[in-house]
Amino acid sequence: MTPQAILADLVAIGVLPGAPNARMAGYVQAYLARYGVDCAVLTGPEGDRVNLFATIGPRDVPGYILSGHMDVVPVAGQVWTSDPFRLRVEDGRLYGRGTSDMKGYLACMLAMVPAFQAMALRRPIHLAFSYDEEIGCRGVGHMIARLPGLCAPPLGCIVGEPSDLQPVLSHKGKQAMELRIKGRAAHSSQPDLGVNAIYPAAEILLFIRDLAAKLEAAGPFDPRFQPPHSTVVAGVVQGGAAVNIIPDQCVIQMEVRSVPGQSPQAITAQVLARLAALPQVQVSSCELSSYPALPPPEDRVLADLLERLTGKLALQSVSYGTEAGLFHAAGVPSIICGPGSITRAHRPDEYITVAELEGCCAMLRRLGHHAAS
């Protein structure tokens, strides 16, 4: 099948994060089975979502992982020109939810299976399909934990997030948290009988603001990123039910993005310490999502290979995060390189071009020849 035909099938299977993905996983399994490729089904702790891992070539020698996620962001509230879950072809563009992020890469991975099989690979090419990436890379960690039983230590992992097929070397880490402050409700005419949860929440918001300013002023700094320092923001604040009720609860959702070398958890810990010190209220917190930074590589082996395969110089860093940080944390050299543009991701009328799919397949074909040499 052509990558365009496969992409049409994948777009029609609109798996949202946090939802069962049996239909998508079944499609990938059936496709691989047609070419005699076995696929390990790795059920996550949720029970209704799976990662998939398949190998082409010898299993007992180090090879390369091609990794991508199967879920896509929702289309609710967006105005599309056409059905987002039906591929529309127009002037060399292929429109549909997930075309750039990142079903285009998955389609190219699958389309190249027969070519890989014909190459008599001396080093294997592994195909990794993860779930729930769009809500904090929740699924891939369960697959990474099982890699030792699935393959020899890999030489590298190519995470195919949309990068205009330009290799990307690093990204920041992230942790998103929800903070809950519980006071005591009362009638607004007798505020002394209640404990207003919004006021201590305001103290936390000011602490987050001041912490952000401290990071901006004092670093640590990494000029490869923009901005060149870690950041912390409060993105959601919810509290109160009515103006005549002393609010008994306030919720803050905050996010940290940290430069390599500074963990997001270390920054969050400062906020949690301030939260715990609040008087007269009960407090709690929970992690919404997190992933580690992808630091610049210690050597250029994988970067040099991808520059040769793509014909493009590597980009030092990007502002978004990926599953590559998790692969790296597990000891797998990792790089980001995929077709499509991040500027089109998550937007109405998301698209990828036919030329971008062709370019990705050409890059993967060159990888196959490298693995066969």
PLM regions with names:
Residues 1-76, 249-253, 268-270, 354-356:
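N-terminal helical capping/dimerization or prosegment-like subdomains
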Residues 40, 65, 126-128, 284:
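A structural signal for isolated positions on well-ordered beta-strands in alpha/beta enzyme cores
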Residues 45, 169, 176-373:
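Metal-dependent amide/peptide-bond hydrolase catalytic core
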Residues 63-126:
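Active-site metal-coordination/substrate-binding segment of hydrolases
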Residues 70-71, 93, 128-136, 162-165, ...:
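Acidic, glycine-rich active-site loops and adjacent beta-strand->loop/helix elements
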Residues 75-89, 154, 169-180:
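Acidic-glycine-rich active-site phosphate/pyrophosphate-binding loop
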Residues 90-92, 112-127, 150-153, 208-218, ...:
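Phosphate-handling active-site elements
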Residues 102-176, 372:
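Acidic/histidine-rich catalytic neighborhood of metal-dependent amide-processing enzymes
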